[in-house]
């Protein structure tokens, strides 16, 4: 670096938090938080961390970039405190909010010096930009988080993370750095929160998927690596994209139950059986005692699996009754079965996200996926109930005998009766209300679910089914070992995540909420006082929920 910039760096570093505070936050990050995304490699970063503190003067841009990364990690970790294990809101007598602000401000100033010294970035620069985006998300500054994530993606392309590096060459990279480049790009491509259609075709990206093990040996090939969950998500995403290549993704055309069924059966018969046993819906838990993060990663993976199944069938909630009545019996039977599968997937999603919620030792309200999936599951179940209780009294089970009620999503009986679905929706609302003390987004979701619950109950009352328990045929028994009329019965349900793209979900979400500050309480676009329920609610997106949560404080509500 030029001598003038070196002087500026030394001046700025005088504002660095005390070593004891930084040590605490770095240690806490690796113990309780890094398992979620695994953007950095703990052994290498900790070795660099020790060496960095031994430097008298920072003269290299690489060392300055590492300082920014260190500060961004500290700021991110501070969002998840206090926790169950650390219940006070200070570190070494200094308030957490003060430490977080200190780290954010100093990192921003040092980042400016990095950009002035060298325009072209590095893997470390992409990493600290990703942590910056995650910090903004924790603060509910979602648009700024998306903008920063876009910048990280652009920076990743500038430094070639989307291209497979040569195995041997003069690039100065070792095998570990090559693998971390793959992992970083994998995380960026799994960043669903953008809710944007990808603008780069797959052929543009030649980088391989990350390895399951950084240093595979005969002894550890059967043990899941900490990054296995991320790799499996990427594999599932590629699988769904392959299925969608023929007829397009859900939402690209009107819902076709035959196409949706073909996708689902290929998913059940080709993808699920190949998943590692520790991540199955009926998992082998032998490794749990050796890998403490594994149970949480498994639930995170299961959340992704159920969401991907919901993604495949969610469009059926947009079918109007006139169109349904025009379908031949065979297709109507498929729609009926798909509605049951959608409800089952929503129930599975709720179970997984609830388990994940209970396993977390930190402040869960800072992890937006916990809030959002409580909300999304409840919306989908609500619409399943409403669609099944149309005003003309058409019953879901009119054509149920066309198919055997078995599914690889679960080997156990899952109650998807209207009464159980309604209880689940109310429980999701209750949990959101509990989380609302620390999250505007959770508060907004709980309030909107309250409106929706009232509408569901009114619909059930009008249809005369509010207190009716479904017959035994409506409480479906699912058995992964049973054959079905449209599957081979050999799937061993396991989970994964959404398409390998920068989007939350397909479908028209732009108008799902109104943004007029005078009608904030009526932000949802459907009329809750009538039987006519427009179709947009089935595509309530993360973007819209975030927009509402950002509107509230700005409107003084």
Curated annotation (Swiss-Prot):
The keyword NAD does not apply. Pfam families: Fungal_trans (PF04082). One of its GO terms (cellular component) is nucleus. Residues 472-485 have a biased composition (Low complexity). Residues 463-490 are annotated as: Disordered. It is found in: Nucleus. Residues 26-186 are annotated as: Fungal transcription factor domain. The keyword Transcription regulation applies. Probable transcription factor that regulates the expression of the gene cluster that mediates the biosynthesis of the phytotoxin solanapyrone, a causal agent of early blight disease of potato and tomato. This is Probable transcription factor sol4. It comes from Alternaria solani. The lineage of its organism: Eukaryota, Fungi, Dikarya, Ascomycota, Pezizomycotina.
